[in-house]
C-alpha cells in the first residue's frame, strides 16, 4: 500500500535545491526558517505553524557533488491550498545557506487527499473484483457438483477394488467400460446404468474377470490416452469386444446425451479398431523420421529432443532427461514409464519410445507402432 503523510496533513510541498558549498542538514533547515521569517506575517511563520501542528517536520535529503550540495526537501501541511502555495513560494526566496549561494525550486505540491482518493479508487476496483470472484457462483461448476452428488447416490461399488459402477453392471449381459468415476457418473446421468469405471490405468482384477463373462464395450476419451488404456487391458488379459471413442479432444465425462449415444452407436469391433490404429501410423508421412530418430537413440541410454522438422536440438543421458529443453518432440532409449513421464510431461507434443505403459496426454509412438 502507498504511504501517506499523517491524516491531518492535506498537502506536501516538494522542492529541489542546489547550494554552492558544503553544508549540513541543520544549515539547510535553519536557512529556510531564518530567511522566510516575517515574509508572510506571524500567521504563516513556519515555526509558529509547526508549534500549532499545521506544518510537519521538514525532511531533507541531500548529497555532495564536488563543492556543491544538492537535494530535496518535503514539507507536509494541513493549511488551505492558498496558504500552502504562499509558503511554497516563500521557500523559493531562500538564496543562501550560511555563506554559500543557494537556489530552491518547488517541483510540486501534492494533494494528499487526491493521492488517497486515487489509491481508494484503484484498491476498490481490486476488492470489488475479488468480491465478485468469491461470491458470484460458477453456475456450470455448481451444476456439475449437484449432479455429481445426486447421481453418485445411484452408483454401486463393484469388486474387491470397490470400483464405481452403475446399478445394472452385474445384471446386464453387456457392460460399458470407462476410465474413471466422473465418466461413470456422466453415463448414469444419461440413463446408461450398465457402466463400470476402472479408476485409472492400472487394470483391476475384477475388470479382467468380468470381461470373461460379459460383452464389453470400451468407451474411451477422444485423445491418444485411450490407445494406452486398451493396450493395458489387453496386456492384463481382458476380453474387449468393442471400442467406442468420444469425439476428438473430448472426454467421456463431459459428453452430452446425444454425443454419448452417437459414440456408442458408432462402436466398432476390437479387431477393426486395432487395424485402424495400424493404418493411421502406417499412413503417417513422418513414419520414416520416427524410425530414424529411434534408431539414433537405440542402445545409447540417451534421449534427444527435436523440432518440427525433426532436426535434433539437444541430447543428454537418460538420467539427465529433465534437463533437456522443451521442444516439438523427444526420443528416448527406454520404455516410457510413470517416473520418466513425470520428468517430461507437458514439454513435448510427441514422444518416441521403445514402448510405453503410461497414459500420456501427448502423442506417444513406440517401436511396435512403426514396425
Swiss-Prot record:
Classification via PROSITE patterns: TOPRIM
GO MF annotation, one: poly(A) binding
InterPro entries: DnaG_primase, Primase_DnaG_arc, TOPRIM_DnaG/twinkle, TOPRIM_dom
SMART domains per record: TOPRIM
BP GO terms, sorted: DNA replication, synthesis of primer
Ranges where the Toprim domain occurs: 173-248
Reaction(s) the record says it catalyses: ssDNA + n NTP = ssDNA/pppN(pN)n-1 hybrid + (n-1) diphosphate
Gene3D superfamilies listed in its UniProt record: 3.40.1360.10
Cofactor note: Binds two Mg(2+) per subunit.
A Pfam family reported for this protein in Swiss-Prot or TrEMBL: Toprim_4
Annotated binding of Mg(2+) 2, by residue: 221, 223
Keywords: DNA replication, DNA-directed RNA polymerase, Exosome, Magnesium, Metal-binding, Nucleotidyltransferase, Primosome, Transcription, Transferase
One GO cellular component term: exosome (RNase complex)
EC number: 2.7.7.101
Origin superkingdom: Archaea
Cofactor: Mg(2+)
Binding positions for Mg(2+) 1 per the UniProt entry: 179, 221
Subunit structure: Forms a ternary complex with MCM helicase and DNA. Component of the archaeal exosome complex.
Protein family per UniProt: Belongs to the archaeal DnaG primase family.
Role description: RNA polymerase that catalyzes the synthesis of short RNA molecules used as primers for DNA polymerase during DNA replication. Also part of the exosome, which is a complex involved in RNA degradation. Acts as a poly(A)-binding protein that enhances the interaction between heteromeric, adenine-rich transcripts and the exosome.
Protein name, per record: DNA primase DnaG
Organism: Nanoarchaeum equitans (strain Kin4-M)
Encoding gene (name): dnaG
Amino acid at each position: 500500500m502507498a504511504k501517506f503523510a499523517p491524516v491531518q496533513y492535506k498537502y506536501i510541498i516538494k522542492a529541489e535545491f542546489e547550494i554552492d558549498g558544503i553544508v549540513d542538514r541543520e544549515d539547510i533547515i535553519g536557512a529556510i526558517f531564518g530567511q522566510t521569517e516575517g515574509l508572510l506575517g506571524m500567521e504563516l511563520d513556519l515555526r509558529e505553524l509547526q508549534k500549532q501542528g499545521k506544518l510537519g517536520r521538514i525532511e531533507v535529503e541531500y548529497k555532495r557533488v564536488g563543492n556543491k550540495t544538492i537535494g530535496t526537501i518535503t514539507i507536509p501541511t494541513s493549511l488551505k491550498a492558498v496558504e500552502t502555495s504562499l509558503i511554497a513560494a516563500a521557500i523559493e526566496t531562500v538564496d543562501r545557506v550560511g555563506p554559500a549561494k543557494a537556489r530552491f525550486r518547488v517541483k510540486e505540491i501534492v494533494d494528499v487527499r487526491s493521492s488517497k482518493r486515487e489509491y481508494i479508487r484503484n484498491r476498490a476496483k481490486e476488492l470489488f473484483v475479488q468480491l465478485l470472484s468469491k461470491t458470484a457462483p460458477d453456475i456450470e461448476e455448481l451444476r456439475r457438483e449437484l449432479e455429481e452428488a445426486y447421481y453418485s447416490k445411484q452408483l454401486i461399488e463393484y469388486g474387491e477394488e470397490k470400483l464405481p459402477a452403475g446399478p445394472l453392471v452385474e445384471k446386464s449381459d453387456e457392460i460399458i467400460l470407462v476410465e474413471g468415476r466422473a465418466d461413470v457418473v456422466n453415463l448414469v446421468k444419461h440413463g446408461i446404468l450398465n457402466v463400470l469405471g476402472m479408476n485409472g490405468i492400472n487394470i483391476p482384477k475384477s475388470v479382467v474377470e468380468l470381461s470373461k463373462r460379459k460383452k464389453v464395450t470400451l468407451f474411451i476419451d477422444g485423445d491418444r490416452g485411450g490407445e494406452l488404456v486398451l493396450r493395458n487391458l489387453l496386456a492384463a488379459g481382458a476380453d474387449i469386444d468393442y471400442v467406442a471413442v468420444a469425439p476428438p479432444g473430448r472426454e467421456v465425462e463431459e459428453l452430452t446425451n446425444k454425443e454419448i449415444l452417437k459414440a456408442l452407436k458408432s462402436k466398432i469391433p476390437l479387431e477393426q479398431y486395432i487395424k485402424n490404429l495400424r493404418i493411421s501410423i502406417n499412413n503417417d508421412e513422418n513414419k520414416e523420421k520416427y524410425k530414424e530418430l529411434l534408431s539414433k537413440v537405440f542402445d545409447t541410454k540417451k534421449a534427444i529432443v527435436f523440432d518440427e522438422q525433426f532436426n535434433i536440438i539437444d541430447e543428454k543421458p537418460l538420467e539427465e532427461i529433465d534437463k533437456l529443453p522443451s521442444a516439438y518432440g523427444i526420443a528416448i532409449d527406454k520404455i516410457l514409464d510413470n517416473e520418466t513421464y513425470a520428468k517430461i510431461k507437458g514439454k513435448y507434443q510427441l514422444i518416441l519410445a521403445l514402448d510405453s505403459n503410461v497414459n500420456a496426454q501427448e502423442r506417444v509412438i513406440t517401436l511396435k507402432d512403426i514396425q
